[in-house]
Each structure stands twice: as structure tokens, then as C-alpha cells.
Regions:
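Surface-exposed loops/turns
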Residues: 56, 68-69
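Short proline/glycine- and polar residue-rich coil/turn motifs
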Residues: 54-58, 120-122
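Bacterial Sec-dependent N-terminal signal peptides
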Residues: 1-22
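A short tyrosine-centered beta-strand micro-motif
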Residues: 70-76
């Protein structure tokens, strides 16, 4: 009986110490059509999650659960014509709205990766707002 009580106590501590980290992204765009493509990257610039979600009322909400605590980055674009890619002009400049976490912009290319990093920790949901331009 004492072994069973110890086991139950151990399991209880496991649930208390386990963290279910949640990040919710509110993505705002200029138009009410197409889909938002979003990539979540870890601090090593490796893709850990991806999502494609329809835009409704010029907004898309994406929620990732069961993340590990740490630093992450997001890049997103609004595929307005539903062709599955970010359209660019002949010079490689995007013709569709795009954005990064922390709403940073780069000069003549994407921003420095370090500037897009944000922290996920604790027992509460982290909410990130990204404006696509």
C-alpha cells in the first residue's frame, strides 16, 4: 500500500512539473481572402511547426500547444491568390503581405534572425501579434 501511495505521489509531481506551453499568434493583414502561411522556428533557426489557416475578417489566429520553453521566431505571409507561395516581383521583393515576430522588418531582405526571437516560458499562454505588410 505504501508503494502505491508513493507511486501516486510521484505521478502527481510529474503532472505539476510538466509544462504545457501554448503560443497563440494573431496575424492581421490588409485583405480578407486567401490563407496565412506561418512557420515557427526554434533558436537554431530550424522549423518546429508550420500552419496554413484561412484569413477571416482580415485576421488569422494560429495556436501551437505542447511547446518546450525557449526562444522562438515566426515568419508568416498572406497568400492572397491561393497559389501556395509568396509572390515576388522580378527583383525578389514580395508582392504579398509578410511579417516576422516582434514585427521587425529587414533592409533589403529579411530581418536579422536574433531580432525576431521571443521567449516562451511559464504556465500561461504567450500571445504574439504579427502585422503583415
Amino acid at each position: 500500500m505504501k508503494l502505491l501511495q508513493t507511486f501516486i505521489l510521484f505521478i502527481g509531481f510529474q503532472f505539476i512539473s510538466a509544462q504545457i506551453l501554448i503560443v497563440e499568434f494573431d496575424v492581421q493583414s490588409q485583405k480578407d481572402n486567401g490563407k496565412v502561411f506561418l512557420r515557427l522556428k526554434n533558436d537554431q533557426n530550424e522549423i518546429v511547426r508550420e500552419s496554413i489557416i484561412p484569413v477571416e475578417n482580415k485576421k488569422a489566429t494560429i495556436r501551437f500547444t505542447d511547446l518546450s520553453a525557449g526562444s522562438y521566431s515566426v515568419e508568416a505571409f498572406h497568400d492572397q491568390n491561393n497559389n501556395g507561395k509568396l509572390d515576388t516581383n522580378p527583383f525578389g521583393i514580395p508582392k504579398e503581405p509578410y511579417g516576422f515576430s516582434n514585427n521587425v522588418r529587414g533592409n533589403f531582405g529579411p530581418p536579422d534572425f536574433e531580432l525576431t526571437l521571443f521567449q516562451v516560458s511559464g504556465m500561461t499562454a504567450t500571445k504574439i501579434k504579427i502585422v503583415l505588410r
